[in-house]
Amino acid sequence: MVLAILTPLITGIVTVSILVVGYHINMILGCVIETIMCYQILAVKSLQSRKYEVYYALDKEGLQQARNAVAMIVGRDTKQLDEHGVVRAAVETVAENTSDGVIAPLFYMMLFGAAGGFVYKAVNTMDSMIGYKNDKYLYFGRFAAKLDDVVNFIPARIGGCLMVVSAGIAQLAEKCNTKDKTNSHYSIGNAWKIFKSDRKKHSSPNAAQTESACAGALKVALSGDNYYFGKLVHKPQIGEAIRPLEAGDIGRSNILLYITAFLMVIIVLLIRLIIMLAVR
């Protein structure tokens, strides 16, 4: 509990101190420092890079390399995963991290600037490090996990709704760029349907928000049983397998991530603009 509180607190103090010094020296310098900080907080580029490595391994290097690549981005055991399991793991990670890697940082940067983004990332990192539900970390990491649930509660729901909208944009774009106007890999209708029905099918109150929207958008089934630290963990299926998962869905989930991130950036900029105009 102490670690989960002290880490975000120290992170916030250090970040604010750097910004105060920067803005005190020069307003432009302060803006540059805060802009660099905000860029570093967002995980879009690193997420895309990792998922491309998984896709490339599946396409060019074989299943074992794909397992190794996906092991770098998931907490589950990957040694026994087949191709479907590797793709599912990658897509699920994109879906979940759309919320805690992109939407939530933007949300807290909108409210509190770069300091808010860094404090949020510290909370999220503590959950990733010690928030596991196993015998070793169950009690030690419980507070970190609960704190992460609290700070992600609103952003996760914003992310889920925006991903549904993103499904519609992706569906329209795909139809405009293909000869087949009747079939699409995306479906805004199914995204909304699965988001409403499956967004609570997870032990975490937040994890299935964007995952359900992504599963519905791609018309595939996600989640289900996985092995963690050698033990089988049963999880409910999220989504309906209207079509089977394929390697291309890794890229499609990334497209949903980028559109969702873009929509959130627009919302953040509009809100901050309204606030600036209101306080003048």
Segments (PLM) and residue ranges:
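Hydrophobic alpha-helical transmembrane segments
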Residues: M1-F118, G131-R280
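Active-site His/Glu-centered metal-binding helix of metallohydrolases
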Residues: A122, M126, I130
